[in-house]
């Protein structure tokens, strides 16, 4: 598969997951050892959430924190079970996140990010929803080895 056009080429190095069905897609990359980039389109299913959890197992076992960038600009909807699974995944790996960044154009996806963000904020995981421009700026800074 080709790298998503929504992301800079250097963010799509080292693909660790590529799931597709008739309703959507989920791609995941680790362009640097401590950076996880996801790109979701269409509908986020529980099967996609299960794939996410499996694909990131080794990454979460490392003794280091990870910056997560979720490009969900083309994601239109999600199953509530997928949101629950990914929220539980974040909670179970809460010491592994340095920052978690999202961009989306969907009100439904933004609502899901807000609900999950409220749940994980209780254990000091910061979830930030950005404009596309700010998301790309932060991703660029992180890929260059600096923090935004």
Predicted regions and their residues:
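Amphipathic, Lys/Arg-enriched alpha-helical "gate/interface" segment within cytosolic domains
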Residues: 2-148
């Amino acid at each position: 598969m080709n790298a998503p056009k929504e992301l800079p080429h250097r963010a799509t190095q080292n693909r660790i997951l590529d799931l597709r069905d008739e309703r959507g897609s989920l791609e995941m990359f680790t362009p640097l050892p401590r950076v996880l980039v996801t790109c979701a389109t269409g509908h986020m299913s529980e099967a996609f959430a299960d794939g996410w959890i499996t694909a990131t197992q080794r990454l979460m076992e490392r003794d280091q924190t990870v910056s997560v960038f979720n490009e969900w600009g083309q994601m239109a909807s999600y199953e509530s079970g997928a949101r629950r699974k990914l929220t539980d995944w974040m909670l179970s790996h809460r010491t592994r996140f340095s920052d978690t960044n999202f961009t989306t154009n969907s009100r439904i996806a933004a609502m899901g990010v807000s609900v999950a963000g409220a749940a994980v904020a209780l254990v000091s995981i910061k979830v930030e929803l950005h404009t596309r421009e700010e998301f790309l700026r932060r991703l660029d800074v992180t890929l260059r080895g600096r923090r935004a």
